A protein has these predicted regions:
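Elongated, amphipathic alpha-helical interaction scaffolds
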Residues: 1-243
Length: 244
């Protein structure tokens, strides 16, 4: 393989979770929000959070940052289905909310927006979602009017496993990013369709031959962990088909 897999923990964090590559994260997020929300700059924040309640539950985000307006973004890559995945994403969103409360000072409870972006390498099979779409926006709405009750908490679930466009079918920047997310490690060279400057940097950063020995070892360990998870899922699915 010439390029890293962005589905691995190492690959995802290298491209989207490091300060030198914040322009890649900004471009990617802007493609997801498609003009609805424009991000000009981001500042990376501590991705490890410890709860302040009895259990002291810990949350470690893949990428945690804030934009120039102080709005918070949690960006997660999820390769395997979890029974309580929706509850987990809701739980994670509480950390950026609670940390906005100043300690030992009066506060009027005004919150900055918190966005959770979950990239799912599986079909969530969520009844509330349009089955023909893969990019889903979830928020706090009035059930009767469907009007926004509060816009400070937003969830974006992107089912990248259901993205099947070929190189010839890539029209938008959003299409191109999803194609790269899903297929980068399978490519031998940069496709002609990915002509934008941002992808020039992406392919340079993703080239395995440029890694230090330490980086290579970290990537190989991360790749093994990803493949172990993938094999476990494939085995379970195959067993289910045989029994079903």
């Amino acid at each position: 393989e010439r390029y890293i897999s962005l589905l691995t923990d190492f690959g995802f964090k290298r491209i989207f979770g490091t300060k030198p590559n914040k322009d890649l994260l900004i471009n990617f997020l802007n493609s997801l929000f498609d003009g609805f929300h424009v991000i000009k700059d981001v500042k990376y924040l501590n991705s490890e959070h410890v709860g302040d309640v009895f259990a002291e539950r810990k949350a470690i985000f893949d990428v945690y940052c804030e934009n120039e307006r102080g709005e918070k973004f949690i960006v997660e890559m999820q390769n395997a289905y979890q029974k309580y995945f929706k509850d987990r994403s809701l739980f994670y969103s509480t950390f950026p909310i609670r940390e906005q409360a100043p300690k030992g000072a009066e506060w009027n409870f005004k919150l900055e927006h918190v966005y959770t972006v979950a990239l799912l390498n599986f079909d969530l099979e969520e009844e509330a979602f349009d089955k023909n779409d893969i990019n889903h926006d979830v928020g706090l709405l009035d059930k009767k009017t469907f009007k926004v009750f509060n816009d400070k908490l937003s969830f974006k679930y992107v089912e990248i496993a259901k993205f099947n466009k070929t190189e010839e079918e890539l029209d938008t920047l959003y299409d191109k990013w999803l194609y790269v997310l899903k297929n980068l490690s399978r490519l031998d060279e940069r496709p002609a369709a990915l002509k934008e400057k941002v992808f020039t940097k992406l392919f340079e950063e993703a080239e395995i031959a440029k890694f230090t020995p330490t980086e290579l070892k970290e990537y190989e360990d991360s790749l093994k962990a990803y493949r172990d998870v993938k094999n476990s899922i494939d085995t379970a699915l195959e067993k289910g088909r045989e029994e079903g």
